[in-house]
Amino acid sequence: MSLNVRTLDFWQIIVLALSILIFCPLIALILISFGDSEGLWGHLLETVLIRYVKTTLFLMAGVSLFSLLFGIISAWILTNYEFRFSKVLEVLMLLPLACPAYLVAYAYTDFFEYAGPVQGFIRGLMGWKTASDYIFPEIRSLGGAIFVLSSVLYPYIYLLSRTAFRETPNSYYEVAQLYNRNIFWSVSLPLARPAIVAGLALVCMEVVSDFGTVEYFALETLTLGIFNVWIGMNNINAAAQISTFTFIFILMLLLVEIRSRAGKRFNDTSSRQTNKKAKLITGIEAFFCIAGCLIPVSLGFFIPILILLSNALTSLNFHNYYEVTKIFTNTLIISSIGAFCIMGVSTIIACTAYLSGKKYLRTVANFSASGYAFPGTMLAIGILVFIGFVDRTLDLFSSADSTFYLSGTIFMLIFAYIVKFQAVGYGAVLSGLTKTSPNLIWASRTLGMSFHKTISRITIPLIKKSIIAGGVLAFVDIMKELPITLLLRPFDFETLATFTYQFAHDELMGKASVPALLIILVGLIPVIFLNKILRTNI
């Protein structure tokens, strides 16, 4: 059913304009990649580009392997077995989602490096004096990055695997047992494969997009290559060309994720559509199950938290806390403004596209939400180029001396957040709309209420909880965002993420720990929301 009303046509134009505006930075990025890189692209192709690709692929492969092991094993244990603390572990398994990978990297580097407590304890215990007396794995390495990213990203696979395992009807297991087949390999894993692949695609997108961890560990990935060429070599055209190359990686992963979601359907036509009951276990079996779940969550949450807390307590500095409070206020303000703008734009786009019933409008709306999949360094180039074009256009109609109207301002940073995180708000609003009965909306239209009044008086109150949830998620994502804020922030403007980054790079982990803990503390909010949703729906 469609709302073919003149007022709706106006809102359709608004949606098209907003979607095009959000997509403009990616278009600008592609256009500038055709510019002259002064021979640097050819030089990069001959020297480091292959290394960037290899490192990115090895990192993706390693993180994928360990994320699969952590996620699938823990999901299988908590779905099929019931033991003491199993319900608590279901909640704890999602906690690493609250920790940005770069903060975990900072914590583990401080913990495992030569001057850290682990190697110091080993040297004291064994009587060793120098680094040449023993061999210890280097945390700032490809293996270290795989370890850090896997411990933080496995919840994507855990969450989708657990949902798929729990939705498998018991009748499937009964048939497998009848034919004496292993239920995990013959039933659960094949049926959960689309969900697992979708989670794996999300993990790989996060790996490709990661900046903080790979930059701190000095790993030459595509994302860090974009940053180095742009900032280090001052060649934005060559950086855009690497970004376009990375664009292909992202599109392939998006295609895999979309195809996996499309195949994530199976039906039980029997009359008994009950789910398999968890088996009650005790003793040594329960011990190993608890250990299997505690290992990943400890690596991704508890150990980094304890390291950061220890650093914060051993370097108390009230002047530093005053500075942190000031920057925390900055972060709250910019995150609140960004979240408000994101939810406003998302609500307009999602409501109009969904209620119009027009396929092309929904397609455009979906494209406007694609920015979340792309690395922050890549989007920053596109946004800077696009805003620069807008500034030059405004300069043609202005008599002011300055040519920087929007560049280097809070407005540009807010716009960058909208481009990056609009998918978060759009997904939340769309989820609320699909759960709302359309009859109330059609009834209001039948009674003569205009489209915008229907949206404001009927639709928005019905999806208010979804809008709030989306706003909270967007707020936390903005608060944790590092590369976009670092590259596009106004002069002398700090957030908790950039503040932590500066201190970590100066090897001042005591000062970096307090803002890092604040980021993680706020990051727990969406995890709490997620657990409430899971308890309601599963």
Task: Label the model's feature ranges.
Residues 178, 532-538:
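Short, charged juxtamembrane terminal tails flanking transmembrane helices
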Residues 6-36, 47-166, 191-211, 241-258, ...:
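Membrane-water interface segments at the C-terminal ends of transmembrane alpha-helices
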Residues 168-171, 436-440:
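Short glycine/proline-centered loop/turn elements that form peptide/ligand docking sites
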Residues 36-52, 215-217, 222-237, 312-324, ...:
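Membrane-interface interhelical loops and short amphipathic "cap" helices
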Residues 208-234, 404, 482-509:
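Glycine-rich helix-loop "coupling/hinge" segments at transmembrane-helix boundaries
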Residues 182, 449-450:
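Short coil/turn motifs that cap or connect alpha-helices
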Residues 175-177, 444:
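The alpha-helix within a helix-turn-helix
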Residues 122, 169-170, 219-223, 252-288, ...:
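Feature of multi-pass inner-membrane transport and sensor proteins
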